[in-house]
Design a protein with these regions (language model features):
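Intrinsically disordered, low-complexity basic segments at termini and long loops, enriched
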Residues: 1-47, 508
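Cleavable N-terminal signal peptides of Sec/SRP-targeted secreted and luminal proteins
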Residues: 51-73
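Calcium-regulated, polybasic anionic-phospholipid
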Residues: 188-189, 449-485
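Eukaryotic beta-sheet cores, primarily in C2 and C2-like/PH beta-sandwich modules
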Residues: 447, 467, 491-523
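Short proline/glycine- and polar residue-rich coil/turn motifs
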Residues: 482-487, 496-498
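Membrane-permeabilization and membrane-interfacing ectodomains
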Residues: 67-428, 432-444, 448, 455, ...
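Intrinsically disordered, low-complexity regions enriched in proline, serine, glycine
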Residues: 457-459, 478-480, 505, 516-519, ...
């Protein structure tokens, strides 16, 4: 027996009028009305308390009265009018399936967004103020359609230090809690939404090369919004697919049928939308390499913001970068990740022209304004509310099965902490909070003075030997070994993080009562690694060893080369 489906069409006249009344509560804010309201003169006169209350109530009600006058522009249209009228822009952008794992629309409709006539052969018609008041129709499943303008020339920007943080921010485009009812709360520190999205692939590819910081700059323009009815008519294809699902307890065979539905329609459907356009640029820069080049995260973010504002025409044509920004942009904007330390991903949503290379065109500001002007005719979804698909199924057993398979699919694709570039770091003298070296050419120096042989500092007595050690302003001195031409010290010295490659100087001395005699001097320039050496003195031989371990992310003989994999 086929399952009963939630949302089968019931187009009684009463329900349609309820739909019409809901649609006609559209608010269309206009500055002129607000300004007129602010200019209403209020005289300071003495009046009875009752009259004063009535006057205040009327003033408070005035905005509502103005709105009612405006929203009645939507009306019922005859069948002839409905056939002639075009749909509102973006009428079919809700009702589509949505996959939260890939954080994208599936292109398959679960809701019928093409039907516009009620059983009494009427539809809802509304004037579109962005199309010179042209009368346009709404699908019968659409409620609360509203034209409004919300555009800004201010770029929003943010920094993210991990794949985890970046993906969680991208999920903010979904403006409701999409996980309600899917039993996903107890999974722990993982990323669920967008775990297999294009953004996740981009971010992880950068983190696999090197520790990356992500700077996001975006600008959004919104022109329309609407939502679907709570029990919309389902699409014929989705209805047919649901009827083919088994009601029995999930088996390997039935699981495949449910997973096929998810492959086609996703995990959710889009219930509410805001339409317009968005330009978003994600810049991944190699955190530690940027630090070594002398650019802080805040400086890079500021320079990128100025560069994009200039490209979009938000700044005067004669505006210029600061010297540091100019050096950053000209020297490091290569798309090759190893050639510079930044790479970009540009996303353009909405509009009739796609311009991923906006920053490299002859006149990108013209391209941007042309794209912006096309949004009123060709909007796309800039934010949405989504609900799980099982909410649309009236058969309780099939709904429960679908809910379980959706939860299973989302959990299977989660990203664990070790896949997200998360790393704890304790700052050290040459490491910052991101575990990045602050300066190249530095490493930890360890020195061992072992012994000396055949010292002949005095003619008639044996040597009272000690060693002076000098390194880049650091001084150490061994203990004195009395009456021994072959002294043994086995003394160890830790110099900490030092600048590698400076002069390491040893002076061997014979301590006497009146004045000390120098047995000889030895000079070397330390390099990375462990080295055991002997040094011929003027009177004898000195034996010692040293080791240098480059600071994190540094390599090379003198630790002067940046290496993402070096620990």
């Amino acid at each position: 027996m086929p399952p009963r489906l939630r949302g089968q069409r019931q187009n009684s006249e009463g329900e349609f009028l309820d739909h019409f009344c809901t649609t006609s509560t559209i608010k269309s804010k206009r500055e002129s009305d607000t300004e007129s309201l602010h200019r209403v003169p209020i005289r300071s006169t003495t009046m009875p308390e009752s009259q004063r209350s009535i006057s205040v109530s009327l003033l408070l009600a005035l905005p509502v009265i103005l709105e009612v006058g405006r929203v009645r522009a939507c009306r019922l249209g005859s069948a002839t009018e409905c056939e002639k009228a075009p749909f509102v822009p973006g009428y079919n952008l809700a009702g589509e399936g949505f996959d939260v794992v890939r954080m994208r629309r599936t292109g398959a409709y679960v809701i019928n967004v093409k039907g516009h006539l009620a059983d009494n052969n009427t539809c809802t018609l509304c004037p579109n103020r962005f199309h010179k008041g042209q009368i346009q129709k709404l699908p019968s499943s659409v409620l609360d359609w509203r034209p409004f303008s919300r555009c800004s020339k201010e770029l929003s920007s943010a920094l993210h230090h991990s794949v985890d943080s970046l993906l969680r921010s991208s999920s903010s485009l979904v403006n409701n809690n999409w996980g309600v009812g899917l039993s996903l709360d107890q999974i722990g520190k993982v990323v669920l939404g967008g775990s297999r999205s294009d953004l996740a692939k981009f971010a992880r590819s950068q983190h696999n090369v090197d520790r990356a910081t992500f700077a996001i700059h975006e600008i959004t323009c919104t022109y329309y919004s609407y939502r679907l009815a709570d029990h919309p008519q389902l699409s014929a294809a989705f209805t047919k697919h649901l009827k083919g699902l088994p009601r029995n307890t999930i088996t390997s065979q039935s699981r495949a049928l449910y997973r096929r539905l998810i492959d086609t329609y996703g995990t959710h459907y889009i219930h509410q939308v805001q339409l317009g356009g968005k330009v978003r640029r994600i810049t991944a820069f190699r955190t530690c390499l940027a630090t070594l080049k002398g650019f802080s995260e805040a400086e890079i973010k500021k320079c990128l913001n100025a560069e994009l504002r200039m490209a979009l025409g938000f700044l005067p044509a004669n505006a210029s970068y600061s010297n540091k920004c100019d050096m950053l942009m000209k020297g490091n904007m290569s798309m090759g990740f190893y050639q510079g330390f930044m790479t970009h991903k540009i996303e353009v949503t909405g509009g009739e022209k796609y311009f991923p290379d906006i920053l490299y065109q002859q006149d990108p500001s013209d391209a941007y304004h042309s794209w912006m002007n096309s949004l009123q005719d060709n909007p796309d979804v800039v934010s949405y509310a989504i609900f799980p698909l099982h909410h649309l199924v009236e058969d309780s057993q099939i709904s429960a099965n679908l809910r379980a398979i959706i939860s299973e699919y989302i959990q299977e694709n989660k990203l664990q902490g070790d896949q997200l570039g998360l790393k704890n770091c304790s700052p050290t003298p040459n490491l910052d909070h991101n575990c990045c070296p602050l300066r190249a050419g530095r490493g930890a120096l360890k020195l061992e003075i072992h012994r000396a042989a055949s010292l002949k500092a005095d003619t008639f007595t044996k040597t009272d030997a000690y060693v002076k050690i000098f390194y880049n302003g650091i001084y150490e001195e061994t203990a004195t070994v009395l009456d021994d031409d072959n002294p043994v010290w086995n003394a160890t010295y830790y110099f900490g993080s030092v600048e590698v490659g400076q002069e390491l100087r040893f002076e061997v001395w014979d301590r006497d009562v009146l004045y000390n005699d120098q047995a000889g001097v030895c000079i070397i320039f330390p390099e990375r690694g462990t080295h055991s050496l002997s040094c011929q003195l003027r009177k004898g031989v000195l034996y010692f060893s040293y080791s240098i371990k480059c600071d994190a992310h540094l390599s090379g003989f003198r630790c002067g080369r940046y290496s993402p994999t070096a620990e």
